[in-house]
Amino acid sequence: MELVFQWEENPQTAEQVFSLGQKAVALDDSQPTAHETLAYAYLGKKQHAQAIAEAERALSLDPNFADAYTTLADILSFAGRPEEAIRLVETAMRLNPCYPASYLWSLGHAYRLAGRYEEAIAALKRVLTRNPDHLTAHVLLAALYSGLGREAEARAEAAEILRVSPNYSLAVVRQRMPYQDPAELERILDGLRQAGLK
């Protein structure tokens, strides 16, 4: 996921990961982790169909690969298919009951896109219980609270965003969030703008 949101400072990193993922798949097409890595690399390039195909290939190679379920869920969420994403994250959580906070983020993101806002807030708060500095959990919460008219909470989340990443801005969100539907990206940006992010 760090690749998708380009948290790495070096802009060549995303291209290197993409290139290495392609090489890994070319060397051994039977490795599910290679396909999962390549799926995220395609998502980072906003090539949703290719990302879905690679994540599905990872799961066909290892149907018990819990992380690949959340990878596919993230891709489907960004592609506008949140209900499918929710089911996939639930499957991942059954396969890996000691799941990381990233699974909760994937669930919260999908809930938000499905219009299940209170469930999204609950999942994202659980992410922050595990990792108070989880940047994109704060981002989604700020946008959610703004959309629900909960201005004080939205502004508090915007302050947390800037605490975690002082240079974070709407321009960063526009560049890094790989939504297939431009209107969805605009909804996030509007919510963050209302929360006070510039």
Task: Please report, for each region that a protein language model flagged, where it lies by residue.
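Structural signature of tandem alpha-helical TPR/SEL1-like repeats
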Residues: 7-23, 44-57, 78-91, 114-126, ...
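Conserved structural position within tetratricopeptide repeats
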Residues: 25-26, 57-60, 91-94, 128-129, ...
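Residue-level recognition of tetratricopeptide repeat
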Residues: 31, 65, 99-100, 134, ...
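TPR alpha-solenoid repeat register
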Residues: 34, 68, 102-103, 137, ...
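TPR/TPR-like (Sel1-like) alpha-helical repeat modules
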Residues: 146-168
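Terminal, low-structured helical/coil segments at or just beyond the last alpha-helical repeat
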Residues: 167-198
